[in-house]
């Protein structure tokens, strides 16, 4: 484990990054990442939650996003993703925000869909018995979230932490109730399932 960083320092590094995570959620991710050496995040946006996890871990965060927007993002007429340059703007900002972590070898961006990333990482994760932590915050519609959850839950270590954001979204809550009914509530809208998932 690395030396603990003060809460205000974690927040000072994360909060300038555009995103939807509250302070208590960011600090929770930081604390969980301190226990993990291989983390996968699905749904990066501009890297706010990614930064919290990179600050906590001594290992690597695989940051998965295709930066094409989720169905709910694309349905929002006021979204940056509706502009012709939306994808490149958001992805460029994410890379700028994560550059220090990338340079340190703590963050590996995977610019691909969740499904492709799961297939790509499967042999890497199988060799080590699964990921220590997987954080799902990609698309929140029922079909997309079900696909993500079913794909990624196969790749978590038997003692790993499977968690995500926005448990109050109808698609997320419906799928969690169906697939992982023993999911616990974390701070804010964090959900988690801790170990014994296989």
Give residue spans per PLM region:
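S-adenosylmethionine/decaboxylated-SAM
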Residues: 4, 9-18, 26-198
